[in-house]
Amino acid sequence: MDIGIPVPNITLPATPEAIHKVPQAAEQLGFHSVWLGDHIVRPIGPDQPAYFKESSRYTWDLYEPMVSAGFVAANTTTIKIGFGVLVLPYRNPVVTAKAVASLDQLSNGRVILGVGSGYWPQEFQALNMPQRH
């Protein structure tokens, strides 16, 4: 069985230090993979997850997954680097394919690509895009 853990690029504690240290620790402990999430904005409204509520005392940054994955690749040597998931409608598909292929080559074949269609209306609104599903 292969076991992976999340990199906190969009969850607490989303900090450069955590994005640096969590994958290194996971690699040293023998985990198979680390996984990055993808969100553009935090949704606001009655249907948002509890941890995003405006009344929450917690705030954190949302680090871009491709950039974070490059950072992880540069600071590790063997652990697989997964996207769980990369939201394709937010990105140009040709540029995304090139970026993922480049990352996979630069990391010596360590990339696992998971893709999705997105589900938060606020993110599509922030990008001035229709939500087509």
Annotate the PLM regions:
Residues 67-74, 80-88:
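Structural motif corresponding to the early beta-alpha repeats
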Residues 2-15, 86-133:
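Flexible, glycine-rich active-site loops centered on histidine and acidic residues
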Residues 27-28, 70-78, 100, 104-111:
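Acidic (Asp/Glu)-rich catalytic clusters
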Residues 1-75:
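N-terminal beta1-alpha1-beta2 module of alpha/beta enzyme domains
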Residues 35, 80-82, 114:
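Conserved beta-strand positions in the central sheet of alpha/beta enzyme cores
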